[in-house]
Structures are given as C-alpha cells and as structure tokens.
Amino acid sequence: MKYIGPFLRMNSLKRENIENQLFYFSKESLKYLVLNSKCGLTIPTKDLLKSTSKFDINIFKSNSPLLCVYKKGNCKLDLENNVLSLNYKKFKKEFNIFSNSLMTLSILEMAEYYDGFKGIDSEKYNLGRLYKGLARKQLEFYAANLRTPEGVFTDKVDSSDELFDETKLENKNEKFRFSDHILMMDAYYRYSIMLNDSISQSYRVFSKDILNMIMNFKEEIYTVSTDELSKICLGLNIYFNYCN
C-alpha cells in the first residue's frame, strides 16, 4: 500500500488506470484475507475440494480458507518461520454478520470474474472454483451457526478452547438488525442465481423468505438510525441489481 500514494499523485493517470489499480489491490487483499490471513475459523482445503472434480489440490494446499472472519485483527504483519502473517493474539474473536455477508458476496463476485479465465489461465480459473466452493461452505456455516433458535442472524463470540478441536460460539448481541438480514439475503440469492447445484434452489427460497420477513416488518425501518438506514439502502440496491 505504500506505493498507492505516489501512484495516485501521477499527473498522467486516467480514470481507467486508477480503476484497474484499485481493482487489483482489492482482489489481492480479498485473496490474502480469505485464503492466508487465518483471521477467523478456517476449513482445510482438502475438505473444501472433496466435492470438486478434476481439481489439483496442490495449487492451494498451503492455504487456510476462512469459513467465518473475525471482527478485527492487527494489520501489522509478523515474521514467523520466514512467512509474514497476522498476529493471531491480536484477533478480536467476534463474528459480525454484516462483515461476513460482505465477505461472501465479494468472493462470489470474484468467482464470476475468474470464470472468464476458463481455457486461458487454469490457475485463475481454479481460484474461481475454489471461491465458489468456499462461498457454499460459508453460507452453510452461517445458517447453522450464526442464528438464534428462532432463526434470527446474530453476531457471535468465538469462545472455543484451543486445547479442544471443537468450535463453541456464544451470542454477543441478539438485537435484530435489518441490514444484517438484507446482506445475508443478498449473499444467498447471489449464490442461487450464479450456481446450479443441489443447494441453489434452497438458497433462493431462503433469500425470498428473508425478503418476505423484511416486507412484513417494513414499518419498523422508519425508526432505525441513519447509519442503519444507509446499510439497508446498500443491501436493497445490491438485491435489486441481482434481480435485474
């Protein structure tokens, strides 16, 4: 990132140059966060690719894909075993619904981008396939672990004991937020229209159920804060774009 300042100050830059450079930074940042940061709960790559045919696991065997991303981590990298990595002791082990739904949406958008490399660059194309498989696992995890018994998505705290290989999550705040559910609706709907697999139709129905719930309680939106309203507008605009 230390080069972005001088880059943007160049007088000869065109809008297209800036857009391309920012896109590169964003996709590489997403790739590092999702596959290498370990800033959250991870899934072994071999487990992720079991259902993916004709996939060379050696390409991504050193990665640790995220099922769910933590709320916060220190961006300063530490050198450990000759590898730069985030300091896991600085992680704030909370799972934010809004952040995780945005992560999955970003993964799906990049998966569509990498689809364009079919027959051109096998490594990039396979990265897109990996993203699709990861998005499915993430959505399965959210539905099973980030909801209350009543089915409401809620932020969680990771209280797992490092001595035991078992994930333990506790509710942090059971307050209902429209924006959380709308972004989750977007993520499930995006998956359903992008892939044609055994779970796609179920995800589409699930996203429609969330939409119906939002419509049934739409009068409550008038009472939310300006910040929450901005997030609601963002989520609804994303959904509208996907529907068209």
Residue ranges: model-predicted function:
Residues 1-244:
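Glycan-recognition and catalytic cores of secretory/periplasmic carbohydrate-active enzymes
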